[in-house]
Each structure stands twice: as C-alpha cells, then as structure tokens.
From Swiss-Prot:
One of its GO terms (cellular component) is plasma membrane. CDD domains: MFS_MMR_MDR_like. PANTHER family: BLR6921 PROTEIN, MAJOR FACILITATOR SUPERFAMILY MULTIDRUG TRANSPORTER MFSC. The chain crosses the membrane at residues 24-44, 56-76, 88-108, 121-141, 153-173, 178-198, 210-230, 241-261, 284-304, 317-337, 345-365, 369-389, 418-438, 450-470. This is Cephamycin export protein CmcT. It is found in: Cell membrane. PROSITE patterns: MFS. Keywords: Antibiotic resistance, Cell membrane, Membrane, Transmembrane, Transmembrane helix, Transport. Pfam families: MFS_1 (PF07690). InterPro entries: MFS (IPR011701), MFS_dom (IPR020846), MFS_trans_sf (IPR036259). The gene is cmcT. The lineage of its organism: Bacteria, Bacillati, Actinomycetota, Actinomycetes, Pseudonocardiales. Belongs to the major facilitator superfamily. It comes from Amycolatopsis lactamdurans (Nocardia lactamdurans). It comes from the Bacteria. GO terms for molecular function: transmembrane transporter activity.
C-alpha cells in the first residue's frame, strides 16, 4: 500500500497526513495524464505548419500517445503491484516529464511523434497508480468516496483545461508551450514524491514476479486493437490497414487469455478479480463511459470552431462551464448523495441526464447562441458525467485487495481508454465527420455524433441493474495505511 516516511510513528493525525499526501500525488498524476490527452488537439494546425507534417501523418501526434497509453496500461498497473508505488511512480513521472521536454523541443515530425509515444508510456504507469494510491490509502467508505471524487474532478478539470490552455497557449505563445508546461509541474512533484514516499519493504505475500509473456501479449493486443480502431477514420473496416491490426490484436488477446489461465504463476490480470461482482459488468460500463467522455472533447471543439466560428482560445473558454459544473457536482453533490442513494441508482440517473444533454447538444446550428447551444447542454452533460464518474469508479474497485489494486486500476483505465478510442472511431466512421463542408453540413454531422454519444450513455443506464448494490457510504470511514510500504 501507499506509505509515507514516518507515517507509522503516530496515530490518526499521521494517517491523515499520509493519505492526504497520497491524494495530492495521485491527483497531480491524474491531471497531467488527462491534460495531455486533450491539450495538443487545438494546437495541431500550428504543429503541422511549424514542423511540416503531411496531412495524413498529423493524426499520429495524437495516436502515438493513445497507442502507447492504451497498450501499456495493464502492464503499468501490475508493475506497481510488484515493484512498489514509490519506484514505479518516480520512474513513470520521470519518463513523462523528460519526454514532454523532448516533445516541446522537437524539430521534426518523427521526434515529436516519438516524444508523444514516450509521454503515453509514462502516462500508462501513472494513470492506474493514481487510482491505486487512493484505494490503498483510504478504506472503503466516505473517505475513499471523497478521495475518488476529488481525483475524478481533477481529471475532468485536466480535460477541460487542456482544451482551454491548449487554445490560449497556442494563440498567444507557441504550440511548444502545451508540452513544455509539464516540466515545471513534473520536476517539483518528482522531488516531493522522492522525499515523502517510503521505499519498499518486504511484502507479506512474498515475492511476486512480473508475468512478462502476459505483459507482451496484452500490450501487443491492446496496441494493435487501438491502432486498428484509430485507422477507421481514414480507411474502411474491411481494408487491410484496419482489418490486419484488428485481427492481430484479437489473436494476441486470445493468446493472452490462454497464457494467463494455464501458464502464468502471477497473472497480469488475476482471474480472482473477475469473481468480484463489480469488475466484469463494471468495466463494461466503464468502456461505455470512455466511449461517451472522450469523443465529446473532439466533437465539441470542432463544433465551436467550425460551426460557430470560435477561435482556438474562445473554443477553450467554451469548456469552462463543463469543468465548473463537474467540480460542484463531484465535490459537493455526489459525496452527499452517496450517503443516501445506491451507487448504481446514481449511475443510472447520471447516464440518463447526460444522454439528454448530448441530445440537446445535437441540435446545435450555425445560428445557435452560446446560452442555448453550448451552456445549456454543458450543464446537463456535466451533471450526468459527475453523477456517473465516482460511483462507477467505486463500483469497479470495490472489494479489490491490496495485492490486486494495481491490476484492477490498470484494467479499469484500459477499458476506459480503449472505450474512448473505439467510441471516437465508431462515431467518425458512422457520421463521416470531418472539417470540410459548410457550417450547416458540419453541424448535421456533429449532431449525429452527439446522438451516438447519447446512445452510449443510455447503454450505461441499461447496464445498471446488473451492477452490484454497494452499501451506501454512511459509516464513518477510517483511513487505512498499511505498514507495508510500496
């Protein structure tokens, strides 16, 4: 479990300090990961002009991050279980910070793409570890709920501020600043983590080895699937550029299942996880949540710039209501509701409200005013997302022991990330959305995409009856800090 030096010397005050430090580090890591998923999007035209990208290769500035991130998430989660939170956190953050610096100083398309892949690799370690540090520092109950709520809210702010600051930095500074900004954040956090996180001690469950064959197969399978899905915008589903990586990815994942079930002494995803009621159905709901949340940034950015004619900075500002509403709902409303309402009821209600918001967003036209075209839908979308996020994360991680915390977090983040890539690819393929056409034509295409996202949200609501009925967060929570350091 996560431990801070000196935490075992005192009682509740020290435990509170330990958990608070874990929360700060986890939220910072979560913010950086989500921020860099969205920050580069608005800057792509400037990147293309400065480095001379060919139009067809520009997508790899985004895809290289996504491929490395999705492909290595399971590996990153299990790595933390085996080698300890401190060592893996420092390594992942160091890789992320260094490759951000390299990307900001890139002089060619190849160097920028390689740096973005390095960022994705670092993010694949940080993302599951951010959740693991919370679930191993806070016992199930109100305190864990609040910690997960804060982390979810910070991630949502990271996504919204990525769009906002990406536009502002690109318009008033340079596209390079959207990557270089990670450096002055990452370096002090590295020093803080190195100082306060305790090193590993002997684990009560003995020596555990990393399942390298499983890691290779899972990484290859997820990378190939993500690659195939990401190609569907440029190629048909039956073309070799899509079909070959999809087939290869499915074969690799089939081999992964066989290896894990028959040969692995320490599986990358321990089969016992799927005996927990929230893991199977919960991760399917998380897949749909990713398919709903990730595409909204893409299509709403295009809607504001190409339908309403906003500048990059104005489009970034358009996301501020999303962040503000989600913060209020996540930090104030959800913790109170979870003390009185079942988690799956909140998930169903949030999914229905979010679906209504996305349907409203689909009605956007070139003549829409900001109030009815952006702000109104944003309120419903953000309320829905806020109600779904923390209860679903709690459902997926409920009952997971400390030995499997990293694997469970890695699985949850993998399903969410792959759901985002898959949802975006499906919506792009079905709607034929692009950037060429009149504002009215583009509004129609983007509107179809928002209807598709509403369908994903409704599917989450349909799934809620099979999710476990978790106990309400009424008992007073106790922060749980193990003497076993990571």
């Amino acid at each position: 479990m996560t431990s801070v030096r000196g935490a075992s010397k005192t009682g509740r005050t020290s435990k509170t300090s330990t958990a608070t430090t874990a929360l700060v580090l986890a939220c910072t890591a979560h913010f950086l990961v989500v921020f860099d998923t969205s920050v580069i999007t608005v800057a792509l035209p400037s990147v293309r002009a400065d480095l001379g990208f060919a139009p067809a290769s520009l997508q790899w500035v985004v895809n290289s991050y996504t491929l490395a991130f999705a492909g290595l998430l399971l590996f990153g989660g299990r790595l933390a279980d085996i080698h300890g939170h401190r060592r893996v956190f420092l390594g992942g953050l160091a890789v992320f910070t260094l490759t951000s610096l390299i990307g900001g100083l890139a002089t060619s398309p190849a160097s920028l793409i390689a740096a973005r892949a390095g960022q994705g690799a670092g993010a694949a370690v940080l993302a599951p570890l951010a959740v693991t540090m919370l679930t191993t520092s806070f016992a199930e109950g109100p305190r864990r709920t609040r910690a997960l709520t804060i982390s979810t809210a910070v991630a949502l702010v990271g996504g919204a501020s990525g769009n906002l600051l990406g536009g502002v930095f690109t318009e008033f500074l340079s596209w390079r600043s959207v990557l270089l900004v990670n450096v002055p954040i990452g370096i002090p956090v590295l020093f803080l983590a190195a100082r306060v996180l305790a090193g590993p001690r002997k684990r009560p469950w003995g020596r555990v080895r990393l399942d390298l064959p499983g890691a290779v197969l899972a990484t290859a399978g997820l990378t190939l699937l993500t690659l195939g899905v990401s190609q569907t915008h440029e190629h048909g589903w039956g073309e070799a550029a899509v079909a070959v990586p999809l087939a290869g990815g499915l074969l690799a994942l089939l081999a992964f299942v066989v290896v894990e079930a028959r040969f692995a002494a320490s599986p990358l995803i321990p089969p016992r996880l799927f005996g927990l009621p929230g893991v199977g159905w919960g991760n399917l709901a998380m897949l749909l949540a990713g398919a709903s949340q990730v595409p909204v940034w893409f299509f709403l950015t295009l809607s504001m710039q190409h339908v309403l004619g906003y500048s990059a900075a104005q489009a970034g500002l358009g996301f501020v209501p999303h962040a503000l509403v989600m913060l209020v709902v996540g930090l104030r409303v959800v913790p109170w509701l979870m003390r009185h309402v079942q988690a799956r009821v909140l998930i169903a209600a949030g999914a229905a409200i979010g679906a209504l918001g996305f349907w409203w967003q689909s009605l956007l036209t070139p003549d829409s005013a900001y109030l009815g075209g952006i702000l109104g839908p944003a309120v419903l979308i953000s309320i829905g997302g806020g109600l779904v996020g923390t209860p679903l994360a709690r459902t997926v991680t409920s009952g997971v022991g400390p030995l499997d915390a990293g694997a469970a977090s890695g699985l949850m983040n993998t399903t969410r990330q792959f759901g985002g890539a898959f949802g975006l690819a499906v919506l792009l393929t079905v709607t034929g959305s692009g950037t060429s056409g009149s504002p009215a034509e583009l509004a129609s295409h983007y509107g179809d995409a928002f209807v598709g996202i509403a369908v994903f949200m409704l599917a989450i609501a349909v799934l809620t009856p099979v999710l476990p009925a978790l106990a309400r967060s009424t008992p007073p929570g106790v922060i749980h800090v193990s003497p076993v350091a990571r």
